[in-house]
């Protein structure tokens, strides 16, 4: 994928860029793999905002992605198309299996139309193939990794992300996450070889607020410019620093978002670096 820069014909176009979608081979999705998607604007069933800064945006249809890939072992599939997916940063690949079934997967870097992919313990180590961690050599770059056997891919799904398999010991494999964290995962968990494609997506300059609104993202207002009734940092005469350490709108200190007593914490070998405050 390459980035195409706009000419500065207006303030919103100056510096803005967009993907050239050179990897995408089809514009309309596979009808049998599309489901309706209803936006909720960050509201729950009572109509109250539970997730701020969401709402509006272009109408989308959900593409059903196969995150498990555990029921087609030994059945080869041909990459029919690389498609755009409005619901994620990565592109998706439409697979045509030899038995006639069609499925979507996350498109890895280097996968192109006409390639053949497979899944199962005996699959080759090449981008797009899906195997259990016990069958993948140490040092391999992988993505779409499960946290529990058969639970479906949970890790490294966004554009350009990848995980490195450092080694295996007993029933666990050690993985280096995109954050730098080193974590142990059951060797029965599956992963797909290669890194997620569309890595240049991170370099797109959106140019104007309106393009964010098309994506369903609303403005994020700083607490220091609010009134005291709306935020702990609000109020004061003139510009103020907030008068206290940074907190959320509900008074919780910023940072430290992880649950301290999570059962899976014992599988973390080395924590991610989180800066001077919390990285000690």
From Swiss-Prot:
GO MF terms, alphabetically ordered: rRNA binding; structural constituent of ribosome; transferase activity
UniProt-listed Pfam families: Ribosomal_L2, Ribosomal_L2_C
Highest taxon of source: Bacteria
Stretches for region Disordered: 1-58, 226-280
Entry-linked PROSITE patterns: RIBOSOMAL_L2
Keyword RNA-binding attached: yes
GO CC term, one of those recorded: large ribosomal subunit
Example of a GO biological process term: cytoplasmic translation
Ranges annotated as biased composition (Basic residues): 37-58, 268-280
Keywords: Ribonucleoprotein, Ribosomal protein, RNA-binding, rRNA-binding
NCBIfam families, per the entry: rplB_bact (TIGR01171)
Functional summary from the UniProt entry: One of the primary rRNA binding proteins. Required for association of the 30S and 50S subunits to form the 70S ribosome, for tRNA binding and peptide bond formation. It has been suggested to have peptidyltransferase activity; this is somewhat controversial. Makes several contacts with the 16S rRNA in the 70S ribosome.
Subunit (UniProt): Part of the 50S ribosomal subunit. Forms a bridge to the 30S subunit in the 70S ribosome.
Family in the record: Belongs to the universal ribosomal protein uL2 family.
Protein name from the UniProt record: Large ribosomal subunit protein uL2
């Amino acid at each position: 994928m390459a980035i195409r820069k706009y000419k500065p014909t207006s303030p919103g176009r100056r510096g803005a860029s967009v993907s050239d979608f050179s990897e995408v081979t089809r514009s309309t999705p596979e009808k049998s793999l599309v489901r309706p998607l209803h936006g909720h604007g960050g509201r729950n069933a009572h109509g109250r905002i539970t997730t701020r800064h969401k709402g509006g945006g272009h109408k989308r249809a959900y593409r059903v992605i196969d995150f498990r890939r555990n029921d087609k072992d030994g059945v080869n599939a041909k990459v029919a198309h690389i498609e755009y997916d409005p619901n994620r940063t990565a592109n998706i690949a439409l697979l045509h299996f030899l038995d006639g079934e069609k499925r979507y997967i996350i498109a890895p870097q280097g996968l192109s139309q006409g390639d053949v992919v497979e899944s199962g313990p005996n699959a080759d180590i090449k981008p797009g193939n899906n195997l259990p961690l016990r069958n993948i050599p140490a040092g391999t770059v992988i993505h779409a990794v499960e946290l529990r056997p058969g639970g479906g891919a949970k890790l490294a799904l966004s554009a350009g992300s990848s995980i490195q398999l450092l080694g295996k010991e007993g029933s666990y494999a050690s993985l280096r996450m995109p954050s730098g964290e080193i974590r142990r995962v059951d060797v029965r968990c599956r992963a797909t070889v290669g890194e997620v494609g569309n890595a240049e997506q991170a370099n797109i300059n959106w140019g104007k607020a309106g393009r964010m609104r098309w994506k369903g993202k609303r403005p994020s207002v700083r607490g220091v410019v609010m009134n005291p009734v709306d935020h702990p940092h609000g109020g004061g005469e003139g510009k103020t620093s907030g008068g206290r350490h940074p907190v959320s709108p509900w008074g919780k200190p910023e940072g430290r978002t992880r649950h301290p007593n999570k059962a899976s914490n014992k599988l973390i070998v080395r924590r991610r670096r989180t800066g001077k405050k919390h990285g000690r």
